[in-house]
Swiss-Prot record:
PROSITE patterns: BETA_LACTAMASE_D. Substrate binds at K205, T206, G207. The active site is at S67 (acyl-ester intermediate). The gene is bla. This is Beta-lactamase OXA-19.
Length: 266
């Protein structure tokens, strides 16, 4: 495996055990430069409690979580009883939706896998502002600002979270240490499995706020963790986006970096 941090600058970004300090690995920037992308990748190794990033400043900058918020939204839905269990089916009302893959009945796992916005908007409406606010505080999730509308605050309004905070939240979920039942955390973790390779398992979620403009770009995310043997790697990637054709880069850039670190296949 290549060295985890070839060029190192250390900065304290958080008081948590996983990301109390983070090192800057500028060698990863070549993957961003090759695609003319402004973005950040944070990668943390659980056993050594070590984290690295290509961009220290951006790693702690907060952005709209977009559909990565489906992770806490699902847990909160289960905790409040809005989602009865992992077998609940969310019925399609037959009305046209923005994406054809949303136009069907969906399980919780299915709704997460296809990132069905209408399903999670309904969950948020049923949870309500008071309970939503309570759980975001319990989870220490981003800036915890849900103003602007209960069914859109994570899509276009004031909620913000950094890449560092994303990996902190994901570690707590992995360890079943969120202020939620172990059973409900396990349900959501299972729903997040996106790749099961012979040597590793990936749990992840994408997010996309829209393309924006060159002067005011949107944000695209990929966050999750990789289980490989006895090791766990937590990751969070975000990038500016002003052209939807660049959307696949939210996964291809971090995949190349993790492949270069010997974590997953390229």
């Amino acid at each position: 495996m290549k060295t985890f941090a070839a060029y190192v600058i250390t900065a304290c970004l958080s008081s948590t055990a996983l990301a109390s300090s983070i090192t800057e690995n500028t060698s990863w920037n070549k993957e961003f430069s090759a695609e003319a992308v402004n973005g950040v990748f944070v990668l943390c190794k659980s056993s050594s409690k070590s984290c690295a990033t290509n961009n220290l400043a951006r790693a702690s900058k907060e952005y709209l979580p977009a559909s990565t918020f489906k992770i806490p939204n699902a847990i909160i839905g289960l905790e409040t009883g809005v989602i009865k269990n992992e077998h609940q089916v969310f019925k399609w009302d037959g009305k046209p939706r923005a994406m054809k893959q949303w136009e069907r009945d969906l399980s919780l796992r299915g709704a997460i896998q296809v990132s069905a916005v209408p399903v999670f908007q309904q969950i948020a409406r049923e949870v309500g502002e008071v309970r939503m606010q309570k759980y975001l505080k319990k989870f220490s999730y981003g800036n915890q600002n849900i103003s602007g509308g209960i069914d859109k605050f994570w899509l276009e309004d004031q909620l913000r979270i950094s890449a560092v905070n994303q990996v902190e939240f994901l570690e707590s979920l992995f360890l079943n240490k969120l202020s939620a039942s172990k059973e409900n955390q396990l349900i959501v973790k299972e729903a997040l499995v996106t790749e099961a390779a012979p040597e590793y398992l990936v749990h992840s979620k994408t997010g996309f706020s829209g393309v924006g403009t060159e002067s005011n770009p949107g944000v695209a995310w990929w966050v999750g963790w990789v289980e490989k043997g006895t090791e766990v790697y937590f990751f969070a990637f975000n990038m500016d986006i002003d052209n939807e054709n660049k959307l696949p880069l939210r996964k291809s850039i971090p995949t190349k970096i993790m492949a270069s670190e010997g974590i997953i296949g390229g």
